[in-house]
Amino acid sequence: MRSGIASLLGAVLLACTPGTSAASYGERVGEHILDNGLKVLLLEDRKAPVAVVQVWYRVGSRNEVLGKTGLSHVLEHMMFKGTETLGPDDYSRTIKRNGGDENAFTTADATAYYAKLASDRLSVALRLEADRMQNLAFAEEQFTPELKVVMEERRLRTADQPIAALFEQIRSAAYTAHPYQWPVIGWMNDLRQLTREDALDYYRMYYDPANAIVVVTGDFDAALVLDEIRDSFGAIPSRRRPPIVRAIEPPQRGERRTKVARPAALPFVAMAFHAPPANGPDGCVLDVSADVLSDGKSSRLHRDLVYERR
């Protein structure tokens, strides 16, 4: 799915800038927990007559096991392939017919779905998200072709990209015990062996209201939207709490190296270091340092290596 790097970078810069109103944003967010465990976050913003609906599930590649890696990302694709009441691609068509835009992404820690549309069409997105939280169709004739789409995505983005392949190996070398070592898109051999039943079991395990967060921001009345969320999601039963990832990565005791041999015009070298938590006091400092050192042609490393030492 399309990347949200620009939006993410904007959020990071906002959080890292002294004197910003990040704290006031937190004070303005309304937090609610429905009876079925669904967490709801609401932020009114009346600058424009639009709204964004996000549904986050606390499941990513870290929840997978060796032999079935890639399930989180495959399931992300299947969420757009119909429910018991909607046909394949009807979700996307409905959002676009209402003047909106939608997408999704999978990470190691979470899978998120979002739609941006006019605020007076907000209820459309809420109903669609509630439907696919509980009624995903999982038709075999949709699963098999979509799995092939994911495999082709892996070929294009990783297998055929030397730099991407190197970073995949770096991740595998950095983690020896924790499932963070899996690539989010999964290992190709695992993808070849995944079945519809694997994905269905994974969906039933993790796509539960008690394992999800609904986030709405934009031009709306929070009290009214909360009522709509209760109407759409409140009756979805919570089946059970999914298992917790308990793996702990042991301390690294020495340098680790990995080498990837691929046809390429130029050699590529990457160095990775263990860093403190991103939400800790040093997280923003490291983000800014990385930008100063290596972000773009004006960065210090680029000027030094390309212009001064060429």
Q: Regions from the language model: what does each represent?
A:
Residues 253-261:
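Short, low-order "capping/linker" segments at domain edges
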Residues 15-26:
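Bacterial Sec-dependent signal peptides at the C-terminal "C-region" and cleavage site
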Residues 270-274, 293-310:
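A structural supersecondary motif
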Residues 1-4:
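Positively charged n-region of N-terminal signal peptides that target proteins for export
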Residues 37, 46-95, 281-293, 301-303:
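Active/ligand-binding-proximal structured segments within catalytic/core domains
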Residues 44-47, 265:
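Peptidyl-prolyl cis-trans isomerase
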Residues 6-17:
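Bacterial N-terminal signal peptides
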Residues 28, 33-38, 90-241, 259, ...:
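Charge-rich, well-structured scaffold segments of protease-associated domains
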